[in-house]
Design a protein with these regions (language model features):
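Phosphate-handling DNA/RNA-contact segment within nucleic-acid enzymes
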Residues: 1-107
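TOPRIM fold recognition
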Residues: 61-64, 71-168
């Protein structure tokens, strides 16, 4: 499936709910330390610092999924039509509260979390999930957690595999 045909925008765009570009990430050739780096122009005239923005794919719906990684969100949305809010990483929740408040004000009634399945065993992911739970509770947003076969690390992998087998 060609994602460019399915999506009304280019999947590398990191935009807010108004469609304005918030940030730019580059994928590193050497991913042994970090896969992605935020681009910053803070030292230049009219430059901006790199921030860990959220990425909303699709319109606010009654139920919205939260996952880690904007590309995962793009894939999940393209394959399911379910709106997804992505954080750059499980411990990068700086702008999450504002994004969740926007969703709540625009009809979202429930959040389903979908962090990678290693949240069950990775203490960094577990801590991020705990912080996310606190933010959701503080906003009064009911939430649940999607679980799937851990052989598929992310929900995007699981949905892709499911769609692949449906088509064969």
């Amino acid at each position: 499936m060609d994602l460019h045909q399915k999506l009304p925008w280019h999947p590398d765009t990191r935009s807010n709910h108004e469609g304005k570009i918030q940030g730019l990430q580059l994928r590193r050739d050497d991913v042994s330390k970090r896969k992605f780096r935020w681009v910053s122009s803070a030292g230049r005239q009219d430059g901006s610092k790199a921030e860990c923005w959220t990425h909303l794919v699709g319109p606010p719906q009654e139920t919205v999924i939260i996952t880690e990684g904007p590309m995962k969100a793009d894939v999940i949305y393209a394959l399911t039509g379910q709106s997804v809010l992505a954080v750059p990483g499980v411990n990068s929740l700086n702008h999450l509260k504002a994004a969740l408040q926007y969703l709540k004000e625009n009809g979202t009634k429930q959040i389903m979390t979908a962090f990678d399945m290693d949240y069950l065993s990775n203490p960094h992911v577990t801590n991020g999930y705990r912080e996310l739970s606190g933010i959701l509770a503080s906003l009064g947003l009911p939430y649940g957690t999607y679980l799937w076969n851990p052989e598929h690390k992310g929900l995007d992998d699981y949905v892709w595999e499911y769609c692949y087998h449906q088509g064969s």
